[in-house]
Amino acid sequence: MLGSLLALLLSILLVGLTASTGARFRPDSWYRELRKPTWTPPDIAFPIAWGILYLLMAIAAWRLYMADDSAWRTASLAVYVLQLFANAAWSWLFFGRKQIAIALIDIVVLLGLIIIAIALFSQVSTLAAWLMVPYGLWVALALALNATIWRLNSGPKEATRR
């Protein structure tokens, strides 16, 4: 029981560290001035969605960690950690460095890692895999948003230099 609780706390801590980059690199006047599609979610949707998604991710990782040791479990956890890094990098690239195109590359990699993670998770815990699906869907939306913002703001003068 204590081991399970510690594993859950560690999982929440890892997700919290990832989330902290989103808290550190947030939308500012640069972002507000960018041209965005009409279907951009309202600002309030982002912290609500990410709060829920990060909790689901932490529970999924905890379920994996508590599963019997196997090659699938090890691979699942490795890909999970990789996608956490890609997730954290996106906020830094997009909001911190204002590099829309590079952030777009990162989010493509992130979505690929999430899809791989879901496939691997399903070999260990069906529940853990399903807990990652909303995250994958939200990141797919974020990818489309990132790509559209890049398209709307690129041109003779790079939007990343505004």
Q: Predicted regions span which residues?
A:
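N-terminal signal-anchor transmembrane alpha helix
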Residues: 2-24
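Cytosolic, membrane-interface loops and tails of multi-pass inner-membrane proteins
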Residues: 25-42, 149-162
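Membrane interfacial helix-start motif at the N-side
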Residues: 34-52, 93-94
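Membrane-interface loop-to-helix entry segments
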Residues: 43-55, 99-110
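Core segments of transmembrane alpha-helices
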Residues: 50-63, 84-86, 109-113
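Hydrophobic alpha-helical segments of small multi-pass membrane proteins
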Residues: 77-90, 104-117, 132-139
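Membrane-helix boundary connector in multi-pass membrane proteins
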Residues: 94-99, 115-130
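Terminal transmembrane helical module of multi-pass membrane proteins
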Residues: 124-162
